[in-house]
Amino acid sequence: MARITIPYAVADFADMRERGFYYVDKTNYIPGLEDYKAPVFLRPRRFGKSLLISMLAHYYDRTKANRFEELFGGTWIGEHPTKEHNQYLVIRYDFSAMVMANDMEGLAQNFNKLNCIPVEVTLEHNRDLFGDFQFTTRGNAAQMLEELLGYASSRGLPKVYILIDEYDNFTNQLLTSYNDPLYEKVTTSDSFLRTFFKVIKKGIGEGTIRTCFCTGVLPVTMDDLTSGYNIAEILTLEPSFLNMLGFTYEETKTYLRYVLDKYTPGASEERFEESWQLIVSNYDGYRFSPVGERLFNSTILTYFLKKFAANAGSIPPELIDENLRTDINWIRRLTLSLTNAKEMLDALVIDDELSYNVSDLSSKFNKKKFFEKEFYPVSLFYLGMTTLKSAYRMVLPNMTMRSIYMDYYNQLNKIEGNASRYVPVYELYDSNRSFEPLVQNYFEQYLGQFPAQVFDKINENFIRCSFYELVSRYLSHCYTFAIEQNNSFGRSDFEMTGIPGTDYYTDDRVVEFKYYRSKDADRMLALTEPLAEHVEQVKGYAEDTKKKFPNYNVRSYVVYICANKGWKCWEV
């Protein structure tokens, strides 16, 4: 089998190029970045920010000039280099490596211990310019940076290019751990962090620093630093940079074809379409402007593609990168109270959307605003837990995030997930492939745990999301799933498709869910067959699937959930 060249968790640009890993070329954004002195680019966790930082470091570092063709040959910038390539003294900081502490003294000590090293590394890499220069002060990151800048300026040395990865990582950790008083100290007065950024601000003003490029997740810390770094230019929502991180549809399709061609030679076009549909259902949906392209989270997608390649083109059993589940800590912290958390989750898993003010998508906002209830949608947007549907509404970005939210919803509402409730039915499904018992089990064992008043609040969106979350727990090793799958006949409620290489391959189930509240329950439960329009609807979806994949055995169902009074399931 060919060597796996899908770079999951590879954030070193030189390592990626040396080892022949697949690289989605983002070097065309370099010329645009050169128009800024203090750019800040924010994206949710695991969106490829560290690789971008590494790429820029290798592009601008004067000590890497002899490797330019090796590292950038075949890329856009390799064919269109700017005059500034390999011209600077590069200092690269990574705040995500910061060790936390419970007081200012400990944080300052850890900050300095971490951030003195990059300045020393730059000095040693450029010893040909610095001769016998030695720092007169050690152990203070701001003072050492200032001393190096002063020496470089006095000797007419090249300018400094500073890169700061995850600038807000440790301050965000203070927020998620409810240590607001310490956060306030770090971002105000003459704290070690403000002093550090003041040195950078001064260096940019004097011309000794060419650029300081920061990545992060939230604009909160940058805003709370106020005058300490009021020169920051946040590019997050700028149209020309929207696709700088994350993969577009075109980039993702090219990536998928590369994987299929290399690891499953001779794969049919149908195989490509099957894989593409799975990817869109599970990973698609991020949009950072109401008019922007939809983007894939690059790290999550690469996680899938690496497993896909390692399995020689078979769908991996685990589609969710478990590292994402830690984002739930932000929901707990953001909402502050159980009531607020439940209200927000109700809006997302029941109504499937949150309304927002487009003017709130500003480049900067402070901690106080971040935790205001009316601002939750925007806060979640920056965290990557919602995305833009339109200029008025936000939604969950994809099936991966739906699963995470649904799991948290069940936790908050104390819905038991013990396997004994569900396993017997799914074991039986392995042998008889009967869909109806899955609906019965869902109604009795899952919905049966909710109090009566909940059934006046939930709707079809909740039914399909919660049904998906339950079924995917036990059948994800043999089926892939889609909710509101786009096709020419409309958007199907729920579809489960057998995974290639398993005994379930070509088995496809299309389901139309209808939910009725108590007042209509008895009338609907008395029906002996589903309403004609519902049959027509689901058959249209099934025909669409059959046209796309003629070898599939497509079966269609209409399911009525009638409050907490009963259910109906017909195969049509």
What does each of the following model-derived ranges do?
Residues 147-155, 182-210, 541-544:
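Substrate-engagement module of ASCE P-loop NTPases
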Residues 156-186:
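Conserved P-loop NTPase "ATPase switch" module shared by AAA+ and STAND
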Residues 221-227, 235-306:
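Amphipathic alpha-helical segments of the small helical/lid subdomains adjacent to P-loop NTPase cores
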Residues 232, 294-534, 542, 572:
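Extended alpha-helical interface modules used as scaffolds for assembling large macromolecular complexes
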Residues 1-46, 51-60, 69-77:
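Walker A/P-loop-proximal flanking segment of P-loop NTPase domains
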Residues 14, 61-124:
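P-loop NTPase motor core
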Residues 163-165, 194-195, 209-217:
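Structural recognition of the conserved hydrophobic beta-strand(s) that form the central parallel beta-sheet
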Residues 526-571:
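Nucleic-acid nuclease catalytic cores
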